[in-house]
Curated annotation (Swiss-Prot):
Keywords: Amino-acid biosynthesis, Aminotransferase, Histidine biosynthesis, Pyridoxal phosphate, Transferase. One of its GO terms (biological process) is L-histidine biosynthetic process. It holds the Pfam family Aminotran_1_2. GO terms for molecular function: histidinol-phosphate transaminase activity; pyridoxal phosphate binding. Its EC number is 2.6.1.9. This is Histidinol-phosphate aminotransferase. Its cofactor is pyridoxal 5'-phosphate. NCBIfam families: hisC. The gene is hisC. SUPFAM superfamilies: PLP-dependent transferases (SSF53383). The modification N6-(pyridoxal phosphate)lysine is found at K240. It catalyses: L-histidinol phosphate + 2-oxoglutarate = 3-(imidazol-4-yl)-2-oxopropyl phosphate + L-glutamate.
Length: 376
């Protein structure tokens, strides 16, 4: 009996080793920086009011939906490359540049990913702000690069760029990437100032990327400067003001040689046909985004004033979201009412601007929760 148990034990150990050893062997083959890389911190909800992802609260216009429907039956075929060229031409016209200056991508993230994978290499150093869009750090860690972060300066109800530090640190890096307006503060950073862009472009050893995901809300751009400073790139998206988040449409505005280099790592089929049709149709008729921006701006003021009236520390914004600082769990309070917001760091929260009714609901429900917490 004792002999049989010993055999069973040895067999069990061998069985485990057979499966564990290959797993360890595979891990040893994966680059160390990739094993230790950061992941996108993402929590979603299936139902409720979505004010946690900076989405547009408005559905795409019916004319875009109708255009997409016409192509759904063609899913068995790859789209003709002419469609991608049409998208590039329209994005160029919208951005007041030439088509050869447009790199089309699967969302702005597709552009950022292409930049990290093609214009920097493991061991390079990236410069960005803190706080800023979290995917910069994710892509940096996945690529095995180092990161220098310049802390933004709090200035009453706004946040400001630490310009002197940014320019000094730029001399040490291969890539500078700045979201302007900034996410998650909602504040303008470089304000499209040509002098600052020029200094950054001249100081850095590599490239300067300005992420203009919220360009339509901010109203300023550095895109004209790509002709004066050929190492400057501008990233844009159709996810925000264009209300096309799940269609995953974006583009980069850059020097022709940079665009050619980025295009080598992509195909004419990367953007799915329905998305391409949505993007083309939207860029052919972009006037609707003015209404989106105007309504969001109006609702932002409603939410801002309402939160201020609740004695919350809320920062001003030129985007489609607000930043709040509070040591209570505002996320948990609002989730009890089916409202999702984004919890960030050090008691900071980001709330997307929704419809007027949604903004008023946030104010009402948060007011109830805060009153209850104060009475305990």
């Amino acid at each position: 009996m004792r002999f049989s148990l010993k055999l069973i034990y040895l067999f069990y150990v061998a069985y485990l080793g057979f499966y564990i050893a290959p797993t360890k062997l595979v891990r040893n083959k994966i680059k160390s920086w990739l094993l230790n890389a950061s992941e996108y911190d993402f929590t979603d909800i299936k139902e409720g009011i979505r004010l946690h992802l900076n989405e547009s609260p408005f559905e795409p216009p019916q004319f875009i939906i109708d255009a997409v429907k016409m192509y759904l039956s063609k899913g068995n075929r790859y789209q003709h490359p002419d469609l991608l060229e049409k998208y590039r031409e329209l994005a160029a016209e919208y951005s007041k540049v030439e088509p050869e200056n447009i790199y089309p991508s699967v969302g702005a993230d597709g552009s950022i990913r292409a930049i990290f994978y093609n214009l920097v290499e493991p061991g390079d150093t990236i410069l960005t702000n803190y706080p800023s869009y979290s995917m910069y750090s994710v892509y940096s860690s996945v690529r095995g690069t180092k990161v220098i972060k310049v802390n933004l300066k709090e200035d009453n109800e706004w946040w400001k760029e630490n310009t002197d530090d940014l320019l000094a640190q730029a001399e040490k890096v291969e890539l500078v990437i700045i979201d302007d307006p900034n996410n998650p503060t909602g504040s303008p950073m470089l304000n499209g100032k040509k002098e600052l862009i020029g200094q950054l472009a001249e100081n850095t050893k590599g490239f300067v990327v300005i992420d203009e995901a919220y360009y339509e809300f901010g109203g300023y751009t550095v895109s004209p400067y790509i002709y004066d400073y050929p190492n400057v790139l501008v990233v844009r998206t159709l996810s925000k003001a264009f209300s096309l988040a799940s269609y995953r449409l974006g583009y980069t505005i850059a020097n022709e040689e940079i665009v050619k280099a980025l295009m080598k790592s992509s195909t004419p089929f990367d953007i799915p046909l329905p998305s391409l049709i949505a993007g083309i149709t939207a860029l052919e008729n972009p006037s609707y985004i003015k209404d989106v921006v105007n309504i969001v701006n109006r609702n932002r003021e409603i939410l801002y004033q309402g939160l201020k009236n609740l004695n919350l520390k809320v920062y001003k914004s030129i985007t489609n979201f607000l930043l709040i600082k509070d040591n209570r769990n505002l996320q948990e309070m609002l989730m009890r009412h089916g409202i999702a917001i984004r919890k960030l760091y050090d008691n900071f929260y980001r709330i997307t601007i929704g419809t007027e009714d949604q903004c008023k609901m946030v104010i009402d429900k948060l007011g109830e929760e805060l009153e209850n917490s104060n009475s305990k």
